[in-house]
Amino acid sequence: MTPIMMVLISILLILLGLVVGYFVRKTIAEAKIAGARGAAEQILEDAKRDAEALKKEALLEAKDEIHKLRIDAEQEVRERRNELQKQENRLLQKEENLDRKHEGIDKREAMLEKKDHSLNERQQHIEEMESKVDEMIRMQQSELERISSLTRDEAKQIILERVENELSHDIAIMTKETENRAKEEADKKAKNILSLALQRCAADHVAETTVSVVNLPNDEMKGRIIGREGRNIRTLETLTGIDLIIDDTPEAVILSGFDPIRRETARIALDKLVQDGRIHPARIEEMVEKSRREVDDYIREMGEQTTFEVGVHGLHPDLIKILGRLKFRTSYGQNVLKHSMEVAFLAGLMASELGEDAKLAKRAGLLHDIGKAIDHEVEGSHVEIGVELATKYKEHPVVINSIASHHGDEEPTSIIAVLVAAADALSAARPGARSETLENYIRRLEKLEEISESYEGVEKSFAIQAGREVRIMVKPDSINDLEAHRLARDIRKRIEDELDYPGHIKVTVIRETRAVEYAK
């Protein structure tokens, strides 16, 4: 084979390789294009499905939002309808009150007309008597001049003395009759005012107790509340000062304590712990603190609601909060806040009947026992504390005097002060309103805590077990272990000297030191 032939064969082979490579590359390119087209179509299909899913999800969310908005709108409409109904009821009540006032005014006008007619008759009777006296004087004078040798002046003097004696006797009789009639009318008027006020003021009182019950979902929860070796129940009792009674009562825990605020705090905290399910000392401290804040908010709301219901406005915000604390105070078993509202209504009604300032009378009646809201740490009677509070928050002098005089400590200087004292007596003396035994029991428990907290270094104390035990928390940096034993003996001796109680009282002094560090 010649070189030329070899070159030609090589060229042909190269050309053949190029043609074959061209067709191979074309086939591969077409396959890639077909694959890319299929992938693009798949991506487009997936995008369409995703878009459809997003569209459906957006529609569902829009429907849910529309449903929520519809529910909110319906709720708002119901609330506005209820508010309008309440306003309508208040307007109807005001109309009824105005009608009663008009009737009272008409009755007073009729009474005044009757009295005026009676006075006119008396005046006419007196004038007739004066005419008769003048006639008698003339007759006596003529007779004396005829049969007597007396001078005119002497006869005149004798006649005047005789007439004076007769008139003095008649005037004394008339004065006595007038006084008796005035007393009878005053008694009838007072009884009428009191009966009318009592009939127009109807208030219910529920006897306060010293226990609360917390319902449990099951009896297994009792073991979780007690905790390992009783640490949970001890923590809750220490933080709240309330005694937890866990007995055979199914699905229930009893909270016992004489301080309603502490008992309510413990009840709310225990409810939260049961609902949450996590019960351990750290969680208990957190829930007790939250419960204290909730109780404070509730106290403020009760004060605002009370002022609104009674119709007393313009009270200082601090005084409103103090007023709300009366919700958790009792006097001989009678709730002090309900008692204060009843006194306010009675005083206002009686003031209206007598033409006095009803709003000022309500204000004085509502605040007359405000001193009972202050804890026993502040010295002084509730009257003295109430006067200090009213003076501090610049209340009206009539209100201050009503507080000071409603138990007879001072003389009342206004009719409103007398009405407040009368309303207080009416509310307290109503059968079933008060209970002596419960009040004495609560006073004994308060005295226990007062004695315990009077010593230096004591942080707080709690009377528990129905007054059979008092637990004293002391400051660890102020009292050591030996001083804690001596403090327990001193408190025990003072309790024996100052209190009368059945059985024995256990005095427990607790000194606790904590070291807390945070790992970062």
From Swiss-Prot:
Pfam family, one: RNase_Y_N
Stretch forming the signal peptide: none
Cofactor: record remark: Magnesium. Can also use manganese or zinc.
Residues passing through the membrane, by range: 4-24
PROSITE patterns: HD (PS51831), KH_TYPE_1 (PS50084)
EC number per UniProt: 3.1.-.-
KH domain: residues covered: 210-273
Annotated compartments: Cell membrane
NCBIfam families reported for this sequence: HDIG, RNase_Y
Name of the featured protein: Ribonuclease Y
Upper lineage: Bacteria, Bacillati, Bacillota, Bacilli, Bacillales
Name of encoding gene: rny
